[in-house]
Amino acid sequence: MTFSVQHAEIHFNQNHIPVSDQFDDVYFSNENGLAETDYVFLQGNQLWERWITHKEANFVIAETGFGTGLNFFAATKLFRKFRQQHENHPLKRLNFISFEKYPLKITALSQAHLACPQFEDLSAHLQRYWPSLILGCHRIHFEETTLDLWFGDVSENLPQLGDYMNERIDAWFLDGFAPSKNPEMWNDDLYNLIFRFTKPNGTFATFTAASAVRKGLESAGFNVTKRKGFGKKRECLSGLKIQSKSTALSTPWYLAQPAKMEKQDFAIIGGGIASLCAAISLVKRGAKVTIYCEDAALALNASGNKQGAFYPQLSDDNVLTVDFYLHAFSYGRQLLDWAIEQNIAFEHEFCGVALCAYNEKSAVKLTKISQLGLPNEIFQMLSAEQLSEKVGLPLNCEGGWIEQGAWLAPRQFVQNAFSFLEKQGVIIKTAQKITALSQEEKGWELKNMQGQKYCHEVVILANGHKITDFVQTEKLPLYPIRGQVSQIPTSENLLKLKSVLCYDGYLTPANQLKTSHCIGASHVRDNVDRHFSEQEQQENQQKLQQNIAQPWTQDVNTSDNLARVGIRCSVRDLAPMVGNVPHFEQQQAGYYNLFNLRRRKQPIQSAVNFQNIFLIAALGSRGLTSAPLLGETLASILYGEPLPISEGILHNLSANRAWVKKWLKGSKVE
């Protein structure tokens, strides 16, 4: 498996229009690209008129070729105008999904945007967050619009929208290079998928009027109309989906199901990074959020360390887990930038992360990572000399270098970000241990230890290893892991450490006061004791000194016995969980014979979940990296919006995945 994507090879013609060398075709009209976009795509899909009559909170556009982003800019600016003129309209958000096989280099993108100064603000934001060359979905937030930019071949990526996106897309911009130049893209499989994902009464528009395209879209099920073409083109096509076709779900046991709600009233149980990130994504959608934290203050458990590393987990044997972390890393950096822009104060340093090949096993893992085809800013192998230069201290081994890695202060980040959200209307209730959940007529009733009751439409469980304390979740295969992080004083040598250093543990650079470092962490499964352990304190020191056999490591001194213990939540396959809370008894009844149902090709029901209970769980030791994308994914599911992850990743993060894997093999689940 490789995640690499190839850049577009282009040149600019005499009209300053970008031209693809791969397809020998212009990115937009030589005459007036913006006018062409307006006529072919915006008017062709009757966007303004449809927005006026739209009854839902979001509208979804999908596009088959992002190119320079001109169509996206034009649609976003039109939607901005619509929102300004219709502030109280139910339509609040625009989701824009676009596929691009050959992304432009940032320099070419910047040059192409010079032709459209009216989009300067959108262009600057896009260029700031232009993704690294990694296969898959990259979500970028704009004020009015959410852009899901899928890098890679549309024929491979479009199916990854999956069962969840059946009949969820309102309009299509069928762009990309001309069918005569790019015949591989324009095919019946594409047309059938487009029809499948289009809502009833959804539309498409395209610049081409090629007979094969028209016939293919008609065969897929669209009513196709010829329109006058733009400029010198005689004709173009638009179409309408009038009748649906029944489509069998490919994986009904993993189908994500949105919340059923009227008031957007959410309770989030938990006071750490998972709760925070879910709350941020919900508040951006206008939700009413109440936080229930059992501790006296927020971020007192696994999210409470003074320093934590921010980097992706790339050494997993499951490629879907690696895929998730790559995109979580990119999205998480975007969230950190947002927090900084909001003046949310937290110590941090974008200093890079070094992964040491401290033994044969770790060297093999790093070699595997180096074969994933990742861009250098995400991962590159360096010699011991090169890595030592990055780290600032001598190392005796080669290793991996994550240029965009960082450290930050988790407790500061969580507490101060929640203070920011309080000003946005989020209600925070501390010292509130919720002991039971019961479904009532008006929603879910939450009962605390004192017998007080609260009622909310939707409940999100994000309380770490205590998620399984509830009847609804007690069967989930989660377990606690005790972790002790040591705090050590700095020294003249340790002050030279310029990046996070990872081995069979980790060591952070000095904090911003230049007084101390964090070193950790112990890993004790099925242990929830939060008392200090002298043995684990010594082990934290010994791991560094054994793995990195250099004189400077003798400066590490844990004898002050300053440490902090947190209890993390994990699962055997080490991937997090997000989405619906599965109803074990009903899924067991429906799927215990799943192996034979599939073999006999018999009908299989969709997964039965607890209505309006959701979770974010099993973040393990990578919560700083994974929580932002998990929170955004959950919010997208809750609101029935497009997801920022592929169907394959979603399945890999589903809470019932361990059960399903057994049922699919004909094995029992106890």
Curated annotation (Swiss-Prot):
It is found in: Cytoplasm. Residues 269-670 are annotated as: FAD-dependent cmnm(5)s(2)U34 oxidoreductase. Its EC number is 2.1.1.61, 1.5.-.-. It catalyses: 5-aminomethyl-2-thiouridine(34) in tRNA + S-adenosyl-L-methionine = 5-methylaminomethyl-2-thiouridine(34) in tRNA + S-adenosyl-L-homocysteine + H(+). The keyword Ubl conjugation does not apply. Its cofactor is FAD. Disulfide bonds: none annotated. Keywords: Cytoplasm, FAD, Flavoprotein, Methyltransferase, Multifunctional enzyme, Oxidoreductase, S-adenosyl-L-methionine, Transferase, tRNA processing. It comes from the Bacteria. One of its GO terms (biological process) is tRNA wobble uridine modification. One of its GO terms (molecular function) is flavin adenine dinucleotide binding. Residues 1-242 are annotated as: tRNA (mnm(5)s(2)U34)-methyltransferase. One of its GO terms (cellular component) is cytoplasm. Coiled coil: none annotated. Pfam families: DAO, Methyltransf_30. The keyword Chaperone does not apply. Catalyzes the last two steps in the biosynthesis of 5-methylaminomethyl-2-thiouridine (mnm(5)s(2)U) at the wobble position (U34) in tRNA. Catalyzes the FAD-dependent demodification of cmnm(5)s(2)U34 to nm(5)s(2)U34, followed by the transfer of a methyl group from S-adenosyl-L-methionine to nm(5)s(2)U34, to form mnm(5)s(2)U34. In the N-terminal section; belongs to the methyltransferase superfamily. tRNA (mnm(5)s(2)U34)-methyltransferase family. In the C-terminal section; belongs to the DAO family. This is tRNA 5-methylaminomethyl-2-thiouridine biosynthesis bifunctional protein MnmC. It comes from Haemophilus influenzae (strain PittGG).
